[in-house]
Amino acid sequence: MNRSAIVPVLALLASLPLGLAGCATNPATGKSNVVMSSMSGERERVRSMHEEIVRALGLYEDQAIQDYINELGQRVARVSHLPGEEYRFYVIDDPGMNAFTTGCCNVYVNRGLLVNLNSEAEIISVLGHEIGHITARHPARRQTRGVLASLGTVAATILTGSNAVGQLANLGAAAWVQGYGRDNEMEADRLGLEYSARAGYEPEAMQRTFEVFKAGERFERDRARLEGREPRIYHGIFSSH
């Protein structure tokens, strides 16, 4: 190993603590979160991403539906572990069965998902799950993992002098960052159940929602196979649903 290569790597690693915004215990999860962005930084990132999402996907042009989903979301947000944040809930004009959050505190639901749900309680369970991602700070943690994965790729390339190693590390980084991961999804499920119950809705609705997703997933896999493409599955390759 080239000893001179160690110096920039050590400098790279030494800079990491300077970027950490906090590792305090999260009241929603009872765990310590190591993240590289403060809540204010996350809000700014989410605002910027919202403009891109609206441009790329478009909002459903039915204000009554938008208002209804926002009102339901606010009910759940008020009983979450972060009730003082400014939440916004949007319906995306997309036929796919999906819902997602980019962080504090925007939640997006596809119109295609809404038409497949059968009750208000099922909609609440979806919104509660996404709010669970926010209160557990999963988006911020995923962003931090992405930064660390990129730094790891740079370090591997410097230490070995091999671009091939860096490329392999990048493949690992992509798999690591994509999706929230099974543990995070289960954590969001647990928080979503808790918030649904606090808001006065039957927690059993989440199980029915899972069944809707599973049926939609089977249909999407069959259609994708016929169309010769990859299926578009809710929450990515590491989904627990």
Go through each PLM region and give its residues.
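Bacterial N-terminal signal peptides that target proteins for export
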Residues: 1-10
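A Zn2+-metalloprotease active-site environment signal
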Residues: 7-8, 15-16, 23-241
